[in-house]
Amino acid sequence: MLLAKVYMLLATNPELQDASLSEMDYWNLAYTEAKDIYMSGDYSLESDYASLFDGTNENSDESIFELQISQDATNSQMARNYTPWRYKAGQAFGWFSVSASVYDYHVAHYPTDLRLDATYISDYTQRCGGCETEGNPHRTYPTNSSRGSFGNAHPYLFKHAEKDRTHTNQFNSQNLIIYRYADLLLMLAEISNELENGEELGYVTEVLERSGQIPHAGYLADKDSFRDAIMDEYRFELLGEGLDSYNNRRRGYAYFLENTINRHNNNPNFKASVDVLLNDVESEVMLLEIPLLEINNNELLND
């Protein structure tokens, strides 16, 4: 699956391609790698999207590669960092939320999407081990639409939160899925659209049916429209699962600028006091600098 992702990146970045291979060659290579996994029959979609993130359905038939997390091994503080503030009895910092513009864009496409409640949370009663605000409501956007401060202006990302509200440890035991079958289906939909092999709608329909949705108009127009729709679908399905940077950038700076940076910076609900203005300087947003320590010690790096 990882090799298919590499071929997809190469297909959309001519400066990285081997001179002997064309864009379509790379799409075909990606298709072969992804299709082999699909045809193996080893994986399938779980019926309940939320079960992928509640700790009760680990190493499921949908999981292709999954990190094994153990509270006793103290090998992950994901839950502490992602669990909303005072959502559980202790060690709930809620450092990571989702930009309100991302939530709004999702709801605009799929207002009845079954993925919404598993992905975002904005309304709950506080749990804090008996503190004075125990049981008080805590509401952020969109439940609290005022967006009066940064603390309530964006929904929390709920996928990686600890779901046991009595939990007090800074570590927990919820595994982290790196690659899953739904991602593979979206990849095959994107690849098939580029190859124009007629298979694209079938793959994305499998993913959408689980969420109670059907392909929207963007999937039914033309090749360019389908491309934009499937790139959005990665975000709706996989938000916060570690692939956002890769998917947002792999079609190049111009696509990233139009469909991520400008979409956020120019959205009608942008509020300077609580929204971050995204940097649009290509040299600063497309590449990560090589650390000086690596430059000084890795003799295999070119000058």
Task: Mark where each language-model region is.
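Glycine-rich (often Gly-Gly/Gly-Pro-rich) flexible segments and glycine-rich loop motifs
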Residues: 78-80, 84
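Short, cationic low-complexity segments
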Residues: 84-103
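Hydrophobic helix-coil surface modules that form long, contiguous segments used
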Residues: 98, 106-108, 113
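Acidic/polar-rich alpha-helix caps and helix-coil junctions
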Residues: 1-78, 114, 118-303
